[in-house]
């Protein structure tokens, strides 16, 4: 494959960026400040995808690769001492026959084998006779075969960010073939004798040097990753890495904090989150294996609800609903007669406020939520807003999760609710009649309004340029797990930034 040029460091980043957003739970009871609530696992299929992408990008980043000039004096039979030189030595293309990636206690080991590299170069020579100096020049084509490149790295957690350590890096060339254009009959063997080993060493050293430079650059970029991902003007996601990555012989596993905080940096640390983290296996193994599984514990959603609640985003003034007659006291004349008697034909508002953060619980087949809210009936009388009664609601709803692009979205369905009179300035209310009106309001305003926003969802922590493909959602063990393949769209600038969404 002949691949155009791109910066080496960012190309090598592709593999480890994929690794950097894969998370798995541990096995003990912890608080949120110590453990992560977004976890994921990357499978062998995902590792192979990342490996192939890494190799493609690494090759494209280093081609064309110019090597240093080589000079040497050699003795040629009959002719004597000859000064030989090679210049403009360029690796033009690299083809990888096979590759593998292994993970385990020794780190991540990537092996590219059976590689072939094609080089072009200029040659020149000169030697002196007793009368004159004789010189010549031309071009040559070189092919190195049986090249093996081995890269061994480790990922560790350093104060909430990932640090990349290069454990070993090597390149070995098995064979070399040289084709010389032009020159005297003795030139070919002279170049072979003088430069075969030097060309091999130059290729091996240049590739290793490029990889080392890329690893150093990548480590610096990983260290610079922010620990917070802005979702919108209200909430941000804590993406601090928790614990060291776990590398088994079939997967790479990491975890992040995963709780939402206020966009201004205010956390919800006064809410204590506890859960038991059991060992995690691939949920998609029953069917076709997916590349990655991203798991979000129910506490992630609880933290988001807490932030929105604290930011006063769970208070609505309702003045328009499909049954607009309920926005006038005349529509209530048979439901609350005294309301109409005191405020005949006055327009109304309904002020609805959630009184505590919604409680979200995930079971094996459902996402359930309980919402406590107060609904205040307000009358617009003589230019004033007059609260006349308050009804307390306990709402039970069922949520479904779905994937829209790279966003985890959803919808909500009203299961049931109870209502009770909290206070009233218009006497006692017939709550069985009011209950029917509350049902209409909840089904025609509250639920559609929530679904409008839930349908947009929030972004999963994926690298820029990667999209989910054929995603499935599984509900299990208090978690929403997204099992998905990924696709690389290459729609970002590798030259300017590390390709991550935060």
Task: Describe the function of each predicted region.
Residues 1-7:
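N-terminal secretory signal peptides that target proteins for export/translocation
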Residues 134-135:
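Mobile, glycine-rich extracellular loop/lid and propeptide segments
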